[in-house]
Amino acid sequence: MDQSAIESPREPAASRPGGDASAAGGAATRRSFEQQAGLFSGPGAVFGRSFLSVLEWLEPLSPDWIALDVACGAAHVAQEIAPRVRQVVGIDLTPALLRLGAARLAAAGIGNVLLQEGDAAALPFTDGAFDLVVCRAALHHFPDPAVQVAEMARVCRPGGRVVVSDMLAPSAAGRTAFDALHRVIDPSHARCLLDDEMSDLITTHVGAITHRTRPGLTYTLPTEAFLTGAGQPDAAMAALRAELAGGPRTGFRPASTGTVITVTFDRAIMASSRER
């Protein structure tokens, strides 16, 4: 692939309106995920689990396509897409995760994935450069996700697809507590959207929703799968145990089986065909 055909110089975050805050947020995200790198590697890693529920919304794929994985982390989704398309580009703020992804791709003998450091708020690509743009589990890290979704739409060709997957807030009333505990766990967390907010965002900036998961899609995790030194794991566990004992609700829906505490989150996957 001729890389110059898709790359385009973009202003660094700090030089854009409101960019100081954006750059500071990016630095916080980078620091947080450097401490969470273990969640992306190894057979039990929470972000290394099966992505089939996302991939089914990406089909049908074409062997001629060029795809972009936004906030790609350690490139798990990019790795799944790669055999079905001509080229995948993965972009992420955190070099430590990109290195993990590059090592795993090399070990798997996958040569059509290009990983690069970059900001989802200012994607360094030309308009309409990609046939498919996918973003998994990242919107809740963006203070104003409309910026990133608009960028995804910009770099997707007319008629191409944008597919977004993320966890959702449990309710409008429960969002404040839910986001607050997420920030205790991961300081880079910004705000979770409601289902209708996510669909409105995509419809406004990309086009009509063509596929979406039914309300009620959830995933359940044991707490040890995602608590790291990036946040305050002891404080997080205290809040979950307090809820189990009848205390304030966190929105995490904790459950206890023996010594194991699990949490359950709502999530959504939405696909749209770029109209503008």
Predicted feature descriptions by range:
Residues 2-62, 76-80, 97-100, 163-186, 223-227:
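Conserved class I S-adenosyl-L-methionine
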Residues 191-206:
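Short alpha-helix
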Residues 121-132:
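A short acidic, Gly/Pro-enriched loop at the edge of an enzyme's catalytic core
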Residues 132-143:
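A short SAM/SAH-binding and catalytic strip from SAM-dependent methyltransferases
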Residues 68, 74-122:
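Class I SAM-dependent methyltransferase SAM/SAH-binding core
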Residues 74, 208-276:
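Conserved Class I S-adenosyl-L-methionine
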Residues 146-158:
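A short glycine-rich, Lys/Arg-flanked "PGG" loop and its adjoining helix->strand segment in the class I
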